[in-house]
UniProtKB/Swiss-Prot annotation:
Segments for region (Disordered): 219-264
Name of the protein in question: Movement protein
Function, as annotated: Transports viral genome to neighboring plant cells directly through plasmosdesmata, without any budding. The movement protein allows efficient cell to cell propagation, by bypassing the host cell wall barrier. Forms a ribonucleoprotein complex with viral RNA. Binds microtubules and modulates microtubule stability. Can bind double-stranded DNA.
Keyword Iron attached: no
Subcellular location per the Swiss-Prot or TrEMBL entry: Host cytoplasm, Host cytoskeleton; Host cell junction, Host plasmodesma
Lineage: Viruses, Riboviria, Orthornavirae, Kitrinoviricota, Alsuviricetes
Length: 264
């Protein structure tokens, strides 16, 4: 197997994939992005197999024993055609998360590379987290389909390099109570006592929506706005609230299927 030594250092700078605020830099280790790691793997496409799905070790050298999650911040796929410039055809290349039943849903990034483009580099921003236990099973593969490349079986028309920028952390929930409390502590230049956090804790539970289905099953679920008789006043016996139930109504989340890419 041939190995490509193309440097991707400039393409994998963290600031190209994620914006780090001053809060992120000051947060305790449990909440912050702990490491930026550039991991590379190599794959050579053989003409004998015109369509292949090759396992890729994106996290080679990453210590996942101390953290719960790993986030794929950026992926750079580089390649060189090992054929004459007059060669026709090309290849379709995709990085696939094989945990998904459907290849289409598991596709992280996908692009086409004509053989007339001698050397190429494509950058993508997946930016999604994976549980460390799943990541240890190396669930990623490289899908390659050759099209109209006139080379005999058993030869190697294309060399590919996959580089991945990842971050390891123990917390990925940014809109939960923990993150809200920690941000209050970091934003203050004075020592914080637990009582002073009530200004953050209580409003957090108040603003979490409760769906009509939950209300129908258990009338004791009420938001504070329903138990407040006026500004700064409460009923003498506010209804009990159960805080161990997750909200069934969440804000809408949009998924973009167009991943950012840079061609060089």
């Amino acid at each position: 197997m041939s190995l490509s030594k193309v440097s991707v250092e400039n393409s994998l700078k963290p600031e190209k994939f994620v914006k780090i605020s001053w809060v992120d830099k000051l947060l305790p280790n449990y909440f912050s992005i702990l490491k930026y790691l550039s991991i590379t793997d190599f794959s050579v496409v053989k003409a004998q197999s015109y369509e292949s799905l090759v396992p890729v070790k994106l996290l080679r050298g990453v210590d996942l024993t101390k953290h719960l999650y790993v986030t794929l911040l950026g992926v750079v796929v580089s390649g060189v055609w090992n054929v004459p410039e007059s060669c026709r055809g090309g290849a379709t290349v995709a990085l696939v998360d094989t945990r998904m039943h459907s290849v289409a849903e598991g596709t992280i990034c996908k692009f086409s590379a004509p053989a007339t483009v001698r050397e190429f580099s494509v950058r993508f921003i997946p930016n999604y987290p994976v549980v460390a236990a799943d990541a240890l099973r190396d669930p990623w593969s490289l899908f390659v389909r050759l099209s109209n490349v006139g080379i005999k079986d058993g030869f190697h028309p294309l060399t590919l390099e996959v580089a991945c920028l990842v971050a390891t952390t123990n917390s990925i929930i940014k809109k939960g109570l923990r993150a809200s409390v920690v941000e209050s502590v970091v934003s203050s230049d004075q020592s914080i006592v637990l009582d002073s956090l009530s200004e953050k804790v209580e409003p957090f539970f108040d603003k979490v929506p409760i769906s009509a289905a939950v209300m129908a099953r258990d009338p004791s679920y009420r938001s504070r706005s329903q138990s407040v008789g006026g500004r700064g006043k409460r009923h003498s016996k506010p209804p009990n609230r159960r805080l161990d139930s997750a909200s069934e109504e969440s804000s809408s989340v949009s998924f973009e299927d167009g991943l950012q890419s840079d061609h060089t």
